[in-house]
C-alpha cells in the first residue's frame, strides 16, 4: 500500500471511529445496562447515558485507524482481482486481522467505558485507577479473547456483506457507488451482523463487568454463555439486541459512510497536490 493510501486509511478510519462512537454513545450505554447482570435500572437506567464517554473519546481514533490501516493493507497484500470468487475470503481475512490488531487498543477503553456505564456515579479516571491498582494491566485486558471472538464473527459477516452490497449496487448502476450509497450498504451489513452476534456481545459484557476473581471474570466465553442460558434462557442471550441493531445499523451508516467519503476525499486531495 502506497503512502497516500496508508495516510488516507489512517485518518479516515480515525475520523469515522470518533464520529460514530460519540454520536451513538447513549444507545451503547442503554445496551450495556440491558446486558448487565445487575439489571437495567440498578445499572443506571436512562440516567447518565454519557457515563464513560472520555474513555471512548480517547480510544476511538487509534482503534478505528488501526483497524482500517490493517484492513486495507491486508487487502493490498492479498491483492485478489475484483472479479474473483475469492474476494469475499480476502475481505474476511483482512477484517479478522484488522480486529485482532484493533482490539489491542479497543479492549482497555471498552473495559473502562462499560464499568463507567453501569456505575454512573464513578468518574472514568477513578475507574481506570481502580482497575490498575486492583487488577493490574491484565484487568484492562479482561475480556480481550471474548472481544476478539465477538468482533471476528461480526466482521466476517459485516465487511464481506458491505463490500458485496457495494459491488452489486455499482454493477446495477454501472458506476462506483457514492459515499451515501456506501453508507446505506453499511447500515444493512451492520444491522444484520449485530443481530447474529448478540450472544457473543452479551458474553463479552458479562466478562468485563464480572467481579475480579469470579468464574465469569476468567474470560471463558462458553461458560459465560452457558451461565446466561441457564439463568435467563434465549431472551438473556439476546438481551439488548434491538438497541444493538439500531446502534450498529446507524453506526454502520455513519462509520462506513464517513470512512468512504473521507478516504476518497484524501486520495483525491493527494492526486491534486503538486
From Swiss-Prot:
The chain crosses the membrane at residues 5-25, 49-69, 85-105, 142-162, 182-202, 238-258. It comes from the Eukaryota. One of its GO terms (molecular function) is S-adenosyl-L-methionine transmembrane transporter activity. Keywords: Antiport, Membrane, Mitochondrion, Mitochondrion inner membrane, Repeat, S-adenosyl-L-methionine, Transmembrane, Transmembrane helix, Transport. InterPro entries: Mit_carrier, Mitochondrial_sb/sol_carrier, Mt_carrier_dom_sf. It is a multi-pass membrane protein. It is found in: Mitochondrion inner membrane. It holds the Pfam family Mito_carr. One of its GO terms (biological process) is mitochondrial S-adenosyl-L-methionine transmembrane transport. One of its GO terms (cellular component) is mitochondrial inner membrane. Solcar repeats lie at residues 4-77, 86-168, 177-265. It catalyses: S-adenosyl-L-homocysteine(out) + S-adenosyl-L-methionine(in) = S-adenosyl-L-homocysteine(in) + S-adenosyl-L-methionine(out). Belongs to the mitochondrial carrier (TC 2.A.29) family. Mitochondrial S-adenosyl-L-methionine/S-adenosyl-L-homocysteine antiporter. Mediates the exchange of cytosolic S-adenosyl-L-methionine, the predominant methyl-group donor for macromolecule methylation processes, for mitochondrial S-adenosylhomocysteine(SAH), a by-product of methylation reactions. This is Mitochondrial S-adenosylmethionine carrier protein. The lineage of its organism: Eukaryota, Metazoa, Chordata, Craniata, Vertebrata.
Amino acid at each position: 500500500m502506497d503512502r497516500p493510501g496508508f495516510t488516507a486509511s489512517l485518518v479516515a478510519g480515525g475520523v469515522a471511529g470518533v464520529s460514530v462512537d460519540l454520536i451513538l454513545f447513549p444507545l451503547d450505554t442503554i445496551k450495556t445496562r440491558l446486558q448487565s447482570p445487575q439489571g437495567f435500572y440498578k445499572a443506571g437506567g436512562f440516567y447518565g447515558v454519557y457515563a464513560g464517554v472520555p474513555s471512548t473519546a480517547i480510544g476511538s481514533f487509534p482503534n478505528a485507524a488501526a483497524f482500517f490501516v490493517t484492513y486495507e493493507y491486508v487487502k493490498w497484500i492479498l491483492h485478489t482481482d475484483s472479479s474473483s470468487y475469492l474476494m469475499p475470503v480476502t475481505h474476511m481475512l483482512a477484517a479478522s486481522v484488522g480486529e485482532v490488531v484493533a482490539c489491542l487498543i479497543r479492549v482497555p477503553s471498552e473495559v473502562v467505558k462499560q464499568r463507567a456505564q453501569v456505575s454512573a456515579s464513578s468518574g472514568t479516571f477513578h475507574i481506570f485507577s481502580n482497575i490498575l491498582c486492583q487488577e493490574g494491566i491484565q484487568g484492562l485486558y479482561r475480556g480481550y479473547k471474548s472481544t476478539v471472538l465477538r468482533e471476528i464473527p461480526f466482521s466476517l459477516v459485516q465487511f464481506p456483506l458491505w463490500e458485496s452490497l457495494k459491488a452489486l449496487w455499482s454493477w446495477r448502476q454501472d458506476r462506483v457507488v457514492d459515499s451515501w450509497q456506501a453508507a446505506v450498504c453499511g447500515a444493512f451489513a451492520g444491522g444484520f451482523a449485530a443481530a447474529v452476534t448478540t450472544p457473543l456481545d452479551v458474553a463479552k459484557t458479562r466478562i468485563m463487568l464480572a467481579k475480579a476473581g469470579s468464574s465469569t471474570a476468567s474470560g471463558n466465553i462458553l461458560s459465560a454463555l452457558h451461565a446466561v442460558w441457564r439463568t435467563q434462557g434465549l431472551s438473556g442471550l439476546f438481551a439488548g439486541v434491538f438497541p444493538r441493531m439500531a446502534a450498529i445499523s446507524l453506526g454502520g451508516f455513519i462509520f462506513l459512510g464517513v470512512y468512504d467519503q473521507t478516504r476518497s476525499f484524501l486520495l483525491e486531495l493527494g492526486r491534486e497536490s503538486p
